[in-house]
């Protein structure tokens, strides 16, 4: 597979300290490449060096076989989509205007831009007639991030850079957007470089994962190889961490009183006590409410509100341990 991005002996120094040290890395065209590791490991710095927002102190970075030093960086960035944790939609622009930003800079005709906006909104399940003229403040966090994603792919860039884009979202929105990224990648084949500190997210999304610590890549491999053959105990512990957390089920919600006694008339989708929370996330990203069934009897219902309340309580409990 062709190399799209390559780091050769790259170093980055801040205040006399190396935050990236002798980084050698090749990212292949068409893959989802995930940078993962603890806070301060150099993930975001590495990502920022790809589009020239941060310049290396030594070494060289190549994009499509050419050193970044040879590019007009502004024009090069038009060929790199970007999705951030902060969402960063322009607040005074409509959804349509936000999506059109790069195509307009590239000189696309008005009708071509309008057609592209409608095509992309439909692709992510947002009705163009309802959403194209809305302002960002009128959207939920998940809807804003969907717009952020399609804005990044609007001009069909060679690569999309994603810096912890879903970390501020609730579990249901996060799961839904992860599925969206996988679906769009399968359809479009665009190279994605994705930064996260979440092991489960890295394993779910990545074709390859680079595990970073103290500015160095400790191991770069497929998710399967990282899980089966971690290079050292530190990597093993890091990737074992998600397995050590309790896998919540519907029963945990019911026992703790986090459900509704009434059942909405339009609620048809059912779950039982043994249904894992991950499956509940997926269902609630599609249906507004789901029915809890135990021993062939409907005992209540769930919405995202009950899930958030339960998870918030558990998070507070863990912080107090």
Predicted segment positions?
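Conserved ABC transporter NBD signature motif
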Residues: 59-67, 76
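Conserved ABC ATPase "signature" C-loop
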Residues: 214-215
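ABC ATPase "signature
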Residues: 220-221, 229, 301
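A short, proline-enriched helix->beta-strand linker immediately N-terminal to the Walker B motif
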Residues: 154-158
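Conserved ABC ATPase "signature" region
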Residues: 111-130
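Conserved ABC ATPase signature
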Residues: 135-139, 143
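Helix-to-loop junction immediately C-terminal to a conserved catalytic motif
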Residues: 51
């Amino acid at each position: 597979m062709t190399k799209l991005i390559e780091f050769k002996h790259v170093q980055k120094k801040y205040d006399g300290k190396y935050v990236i040290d002798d980084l050698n890395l090749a990212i292949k065209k068409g893959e989802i490449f995930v940078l993962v590791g603890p806070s301060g490991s150099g993930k975001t710095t590495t990502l920022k060096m790809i589009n020239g927002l941060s310049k290396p102190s030594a070494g060289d970075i190549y994009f499509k076989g050419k050193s970044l030093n040879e590019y007009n960086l502004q024009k090069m960035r038009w060929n790199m989509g970007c999705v951030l944790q902060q969402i960063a939609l322009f607040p005074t622009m409509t959804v349509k205007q936000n999506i059109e930003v790069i195509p307009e800079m590239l000189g696309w005709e008005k009708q071509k831009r309008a057609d592209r906006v409608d095509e992309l909104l439909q692709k992510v399940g947002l009705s163009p007639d309802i959403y194209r003229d809305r302002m960002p403040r009128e959207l939920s966090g998940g809807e804003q991030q969907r717009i952020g994603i399609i804005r990044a792919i609007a001009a069909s860039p060679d690569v999309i850079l994603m810096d912890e884009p879903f970390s501020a979202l609730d579990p249901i929105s996060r799961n839904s957007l992860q599925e969206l990224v996988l679906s769009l990648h399968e359809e479009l084949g665009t190279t994605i470089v994705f930064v996260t500190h979440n092991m489960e997210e890295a394993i779910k999304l990545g074709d390859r994962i680079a595990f970073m610590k103290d500015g160095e890549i400790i191991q770069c491999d497929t998710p399967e190889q990282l899980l089966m053959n971690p290079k050292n105990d530190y990597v093993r512990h890091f990737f074992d961490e998600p397995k050590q957390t309790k896998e919540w089920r519907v029963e945990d919600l019911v026992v703790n009183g986090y459900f509704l006694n009434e059942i909405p008339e339009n609620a048809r989708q059912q779950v039982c006590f043994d249904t894992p929370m991950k499956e509940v996330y997926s269902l609630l990203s599609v249906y507004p409410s789901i029915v809890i069934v135990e021993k062939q009897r409907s005992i209540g219902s769930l919405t995202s509100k009950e899930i958030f309340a339960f998870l918030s309580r558990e998070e507070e409990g863990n912080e107090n341990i």
